[in-house]
Regions:
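Conserved AAA+ ATPase "SRH/arginine-finger" region at the nucleotide-binding site
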Residues: 153-167
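C-terminal helical "lid" of AAA+/P-loop NTPase domains
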Residues: 194-197, 206-221
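Walker A/P-loop
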Residues: 14-50
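Pre-Walker A (pre-P-loop) alpha-helix and adjacent loop at the N terminus of AAA/AAA+ ATPase modules
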Residues: 1-14
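Conserved AAA+/SF3 P-loop NTPase catalytic/coupling segment centered on the Walker-B
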Residues: 28, 60-68, 81-110, 139-149, ...
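Conserved catalytic/switch belt of AAA+ P-loop NTPases
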Residues: 100-125, 129
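Conserved C-terminal helix/linker of AAA+ ATPases
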Residues: 212, 218-249
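Short conserved motifs of the RecA-like P-loop NTPase core
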Residues: 184-200, 227-232
Length: 285
């Protein structure tokens, strides 16, 4: 993943491969943040950040012409490749794109050049870096020449496949993130914390984050000067009905996230990468 960002001159195309809700779009955004923080893209002191553009390929599954115009532009070449110049262009669910669209992407990766839609006279250049995601087997669903042009394929595991420590750190990170967003300190009872950890999330990380948000929203209605305190009764009802709660007094034992011992001194972007996928091992050394 580090190689995908830093490989000269314009990085390497990378593909996140995993089930729905595992955080592929999230990881793509973090790759962008890492590239910005490492000054691989963008200019120091610039007034604005380099571009980051997300393309939902499912929107173009039945409209090849619209995709071609959006990607390359017309005679002026002002499509996504131009708008993402100097930044990152993320193709979500690339397998949903017809082969004709994937072939346009392949042609750009070959040379860094492209032509406007129905324009054979003008040739444009871009140094946009490309990231892809898919829930399918790449070798079976992608345009084969394009699949061969993506040297870095990163498997993204489901929550069920992650270790207990990974789940715990992820949960704490999401709770802290929600607390920062609301501008409050967050604490959570041991019962509620263990319920969140033990629950089987069908929609993976997306569902875990939704659970955190809804629980914080419920606790916010009882906010005090000390912040918010999440208890078992703030959890979604479907979660409570599927898990056996422990003794009641444990719901009074609180975990204060500001002093949570698993937190590290690394920046937030690198922490998330380490939690979700072990791609920054050499960066920490």
């Amino acid at each position: 993943c580090k190689a995908a960002v830093k490989y000269p001159p314009n990085g390497l195309p990378a593909l996140f491969n995993g089930a729905g809700g595992t955080g592929k779009s999230f990881l793509s955004r973090l790759m962008y943040e890492y590239a910005v923080n490492e000054r691989v893209i963008g200019t120091a002191g610039a007034a604005s950040l380099p571009p980051y553009i997300t393309v939902d390929c499912s929107e173009y599954a039945q409209n090849e012409e619209k995709f071609a115009i959006s990607l390359c532009g017309s005679e002026d070449g002002k499509g996504w490749l131009a708008k993402a110049n100097g930044g990152i262009l993320f193709f979500d669910e690339i397998d949903r794109l017809p082969f004709s669209g994937q072939e346009l992407i392949y042609s750009y990766l070959i040379s860094g050049q492209y032509k406007g839609y129905h324009d054979d006279e003008h040739v444009f250049e871009s140094n946009a870096r490309l990231i892809f995601s898919t829930t399918k087997v790449p070798a079976e669903t992608l345009y084969k020449p394009l699949a061969r042009m993506i040297p870095i394929v990163i498997p993204v595991p489901t929550l069920h496949e992650r270790t207990a420590d990974e789940k715990e750190e992820m949960l704490v990170s999401f709770l802290k993130e929600e607390g920062r967003r609301m501008g409050v300190d967050v604490s959570i009872s041991q019962n509620a914390f263990h319920c969140m950890l033990e629950f089987s999330y069908e929609n993976n990380i997306d569902e875990l984050k939704t659970c955190v948000t809804s629980s914080c929203a419920g606790a916010y209605l009882e906010k005090t000067s000390d912040g918010i305190a999440i208890h078992s009764y703030h959890l979604p009802e479907y979660m409570l009905s599927s898990l056996k709660l422990e003794v009641e007094d444990k719901d009074k034992r609180m975990i204060h996230l500001n002093s949570y011992s698993r937190d590290t001194s690394l920046g937030q972007t690198v922490q998330y990468f380490q939690i979700m996928l072990d791609v920054f091992e050499d960066y920490r050394q």
